[in-house]
Amino acid sequence: MYQRFFINLMNVTIVDYKSGNISSVINSFKEVAKDKVKIEVTSDINKIKSSDKVVLPGQGSFKSCVDGLNNINGLVDTLNEFAITNKKPLLGICVGLQMFADIGYEDTETKGLGWISGKVSKINNQNGKYKLPHIGWNQINIVNESKIFKDIENNSHMYFVHSYEFIPNDKNVISATTDYSSNIVCAVEKDNIFGTQFHPEKSDKIGLKIIDNFISL
């Protein structure tokens, strides 16, 4: 009965590739989904392929997260097929967003997924004026309309934990920035690909609304 109940529900997969503690991501998506959407947590490539939407979380360094993806046979190819070939909705969170880049410079020079051309570099702390990692609540400035920002007020506060920033080559993909040392990119949208540098799962009711907007696409 339980399996049959889910048979016609939308399926959202959170990719678990051992990138750190993703329990808050899982709990937030399940809270928003309730019994309307099936939330799956897996690295199984066949389950990812059959999903309606995918969430790519990321905690730790750029290199460790990329290595985590590469260590699971076929996972990167499956994500490329899902997001680039089939153009299904995908949301990257924190380092999950950063891995959209061509290259990252944390720990060592590491090739990213290359979905959105650009690089990931360390935030300029202006000779120690700004503490790194950047931890805590910060206002976001919505600079372009984004489907995941539906009914989100500009200058809302979101929760951040990061020392590196994504710098895309095409500024048109930027949907929001935050002021910390400089205007740091904190959200992007390119076709079916969405990303947040902040943690919506840790950003109270507004963050849950962003998750709901993604699920509702």
Model region roles, listed by residue range:
Residues 12, 39, 90-91, 113, ...:
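Hydrophobic/aromatic residues located in beta-strands of well-ordered beta-sheets
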Residues 98-100:
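Glycine-rich nucleophile elbow surrounding the catalytic serine of serine-hydrolase chemistry
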Residues 92, 96:
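Gly/Ala-rich beta-loop-alpha elbow adjacent to hydrolase catalytic centers
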Residues 165-217:
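C-terminal and late-domain segments of enzyme folds
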Residues 55, 91, 159, 175, ...:
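Hydrophobic/aromatic beta-strand patches that form the interior of the parallel beta-sheet core
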Residues 1-90, 119-124, 206-217:
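N-terminal beta1-alpha1 cap of cysteine-dependent amidohydrolase-like domains
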Residues 77, 103-180:
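Pocket-forming structural segment of enzyme catalytic cores
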